[in-house]
Amino acid sequence: MDIESKKFLGQPKNFVSIFNALLFDGQPVLKPEYLKDENSELVMNVSSKHVDIIKRYEDGTYLDLFVIESQSYVDPSMVARVMEYESVARMRYIRQNFKKHVPMHTRLPMILTVVLYVGESKWNAAKRLSELEIIHPGFEDMFNEFKLNLIELNTNHKYNTGEKATQDFFDLLRMIYRKQVLKEDLDREFNRDALYFAYVVTKNKELLSIYQKSEKGDVKVCRALDEMFEESTNKGIQMGIKQGIEQGIALNQFEVYQTMLDKGFSIKTIASIFSVSEESIEKMLIKI
């Protein structure tokens, strides 16, 4: 997923839209033309800390994007990992730019980190340092809080990115994970790159099939997904009916066997009457 992640989210307009979605409700405060790739020693050293994409903004701000893969895990230590990365990044910057010490009144570039969680399961790990560490009574005022800038695409929250490609990607994941297509989206056309990246993340074969059938341009997706969700729901209903019938038959047999036992019939006699094994009767009586 790493290659596709960098390919899709690394595009300047897509990259800034993630930050605009979280910070400015999709308003184009951050501009893609002010971004530049950061290829310095800093990136070489901190990329091992699992930062997927690092870019510099015009004013020197570092914008960093963590992408948490759907098939991997929810990392309980994510808060600590982000803190570690930012600390390493700041110290690297200081060493690169100041020989002995930092001059008085110097201000370092801001490091803004966003964690984009694209998994299906609920994010149940800490979102704040206070949720990860034990804070003893009386120490609350001395504790330095730290929180994740976390975007979760499997929740009911609808993020506005202000950019079609990332908005389409966000909404596709919500549809797949919630197994629901809104009526107003049935004829909506989705960005083809967003469609493919959604497939890479979810491994949904229907998305891949739709992608392969389309050659270029935007793609209609929702009617096929809606049919897939409906078929899945119907299969679940049929399975439930089948299980209910089987349980009903088993319960009826149990009641018959129990009534005969109450009337003094032995298990051996009951087995002979119904042409079943004694073991099957005993198992049913124990199970139910």
Where are the predicted features?
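Elongated, amphipathic alpha-helical interaction scaffolds
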Residues: M1-I288
